[in-house]
Amino acid sequence: MNLREMSKLNVPIVSIITGEGCSGGALGLAVADRVMMLEHAYYTVISPEGCASILWRDAARYADAAEALKITSKDLLELGIIDEEISEPLGGAHSDYNVVAENMRSSIVNALNELAKKSPEKLREERYAKFRAMGRFIED
């Protein structure tokens, strides 16, 4: 679906990033009323290895690239790119699917209960404003 068309939907949109959200295609997940992310997932326009290869011509510098890209749920929550970090059990999501599923279910239900109170016009207006506010330019 075209991102412009998705942004015009009259119903609540909730996205959850559960693993690697990497590339321009994954960015479409941000055209939502609520964007959530598992705590050990990452979300970025390019993989850390790809970024390191381009910037430093050395994919081994992926850790430096990951830090610069701010790809973690904690970073993205602080930057306002995502709205919620969903906790995972000790050992990660794969260690207890039932716990992760319940955590995700709870977050989805809470978001939909909140969003259901808004008119379609308000949803579209807030969705547009949220997406347009992403990004930051900092001068030294």
Give short role names for the model-derived ranges.
Residues M1-R105, V109:
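Conserved catalytic cores of soluble enzyme domains
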